Amino acid sequence: MTAPSKPVLVADIGGTNARFALADIDASVPLLDDTCREFAVVEFGSLGEAARYYLDQIGVQATKGVFAVAGRVDGDEARITNHPWVISRSRTATMLGFSTLHLINDFAAQAMAISLLRPQDVVQVGGASWRPAPIEQPRNYGVIGPGTGLGVGGLIIRNGRCFPLETEGGHVSFPPGTPEEIRVLEILSEQFGRVSNERLICGPGLVNIHRALSEIAGIDPGPLEPKDITARAAAGDPRASRTIDLFCAIFGAIAGDMVLMQGAWDGVFLTGGLVPKVLDSLQHSGFRQRFEHKGRFSAIMSRVPSLAVMHPHAGLLGAAAYAVDAERALPGEQR
């Protein structure tokens, strides 16, 4: 590995794992893949300790950093969802000897990654094709990702700058589109009261859909995890297969609604750990039909690309993109 002259430490911090890499902001491909490392967060008392361990292991001293964290960033502080770490930007920067340290939400990083994605990093899910555009060309993108929950955001590109749009769109109320979905909503309403999109389109959402379909059929499926449903569907189980089909159709409807709400006419990127597991189903299900089925806007929606992100380190890529964009900021601009 040849370290860049001014390396930036980038990180993608979740509740279980911490991923680190170096970025070269002057390179055409800023994320240095051969520097990527992953550690269990339980092995360290703080993010600063984990970052210092990584830098010592790789033998490089960075002076700047961009850390994407799975939790809310509030000024100088970030809290990791499902982990007791409370991160202070200023204290962590001092501990590492950094002149600059940015803390960003992990889904903001997923959105920023769009600016560096290449055609080989995505798989088209029906509809129109997509090619990266020059950074100087205005673009509006949407990003949606089912995992433990449902992340929804966007990326606005203007005048060579990238602006991630952070939202809580996963908590928008679920709008059923068929009689079957109305019945599913009724069943889930008995359990949760208000039913958001996240109650269906995420890993636990697969279980919720399967449980509702089982109740409609008068069957008790017993305790299940998302991986059990995908495995049963792959083995040809009819109810599990219907669960996946319904998941994909609802996912498409919600992703299409996001385009209308955000004006994300240049494409929607599907991210998260669940997408690769159901990719084949997405491509051969009602995802795209429901994505496009938007009344008077159906013709326009047919021209909006929908793309599954397959890059193995999209969070790190997004942190690297943020570092690159920060260098484009004019003196006095906030980033």
Swiss-Prot record:
<keyword id="KW-0418">Kinase</keyword>
<dbReference type="GO" id="GO:0005536">
    <property type="term" value="F:D-glucose binding"/>
</dbReference>
<comment type="similarity">
    <text>Belongs to the bacterial glucokinase family.</text>
</comment>
<keyword id="KW-0324">Glycolysis</keyword>
<dbReference type="GO" id="GO:0005829">
    <property type="term" value="C:cytosol"/>
</dbReference>
<keyword id="KW-0808">Transferase</keyword>
<dbReference type="InterPro" id="IPR050201">
    <property type="entry name" value="Bacterial_glucokinase"/>
</dbReference>
<dbReference type="InterPro" id="IPR043129">
    <property type="entry name" value="ATPase_NBD"/>
</dbReference>
<dbReference type="Pfam" id="PF02685">
    <property type="entry name" value="Glucokinase"/>
</dbReference>
<dbReference type="GO" id="GO:0005524">
    <property type="term" value="F:ATP binding"/>
</dbReference>
<keyword id="KW-0963">Cytoplasm</keyword>
<feature type="binding site">
    <location>
        <begin position="11"/>
        <end position="16"/>
    </location>
    <ligand>
        <name>ATP</name>
    </ligand>
</feature>
<dbReference type="GO" id="GO:0004340">
    <property type="term" value="F:glucokinase activity"/>
</dbReference>
<keyword id="KW-0547">Nucleotide-binding</keyword>
<dbReference type="GO" id="GO:0006096">
    <property type="term" value="P:glycolytic process"/>
</dbReference>
<dbReference type="InterPro" id="IPR003836">
    <property type="entry name" value="Glucokinase"/>
</dbReference>
<keyword id="KW-0067">ATP-binding</keyword>
<protein>
    <recommendedName>
        <fullName>Glucokinase</fullName>
        <ecNumber>2.7.1.2</ecNumber>
    </recommendedName>
</protein>
